[in-house]
């Protein structure tokens, strides 16, 4: 790798969230980790295969409960990331109890060609709670595999192989799922990926390459791009995207209605990746309820109750035509333990009305953040739905230059105060807490965040 390519690779890593190898990470490690934690830190570095975004680690965890993670030294952090698995809260007692009951019943694995009651009950439950018309499920161990099942289904039922997805999107780390993803970080250096994978711009109303200010203009240009590809590439099997991007960017309903119309006109399936956004995150049980019903809905992460790895797809009866093909065929396709965890998590979210809670608390959080934006010029833009929120930090409101270094310092200052979150694109602070978070806990988190922003704006380093 040349010196120039190394610099480019480093720039890409910083923009896509890798703060684990910077001098500030080293300072955090020296200031906050005990000798015992440092010993395990070094063991982790010695035995795991190193990779960007997760090596070296930030800390060593010993526990998690509700909205909190706890490190080896006993310090608790309000966790606003959770890798998207923690909608019902970490170590949810009802999910744990359901798993224990299933363990006690003695069915922990279901061989192929057999079924079991928890798996059937889960498929039935998903048919009841997903948007109208979605009624056929298939399960697998993780989100990457679920994305690839959706792609396989689209190829089989359309007889086509090409896809449209979005630049800067992430749909998993598997070869196929990374191939349709739009993050260079996950396919750089791998050579040819999935053939027929086309990418277009996502409708970002704050940052778009054309400098448009009106949502209608951004939507129109993004839809024009999609139709241009569809006209020139007739073998299109599907358009795949998150209803709301992970950043998050919240498109208009008009935009997704336009995409769905193009899919119908050109014979492609619409696949929604709700691996992060499903199960109450955006203020509705599924993010697609804000927009349109897709042909295939992809679920994962919190589907396993925050305990077990589990994912799947839900689609329409119309596409239940591939009895002569294998779409997933995973060893743990109908895992009874995972199904029991998923059922308990869904019941917990429903009985406690966590989707409604997410909508109400999310609106309050956005209101507070908008007030903070008036006081802090570094906050360029705030966006989100429910408890799926992003804060775009900038150096200058006229140029919208990304405040990458400042965002990193703010993150480490917040960690020292007991607040954990993830940065995306180098400068966007993402807030995705467990849905059980209270207003008082959210206020505490926002107070910590504002303290850190204020210090950085006044010129304090880390």
Label each region the model flagged.
Residues 7-462:
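Conserved N-terminal phosphate-binding loop of PLP-dependent enzymes in the Aspartate aminotransferase
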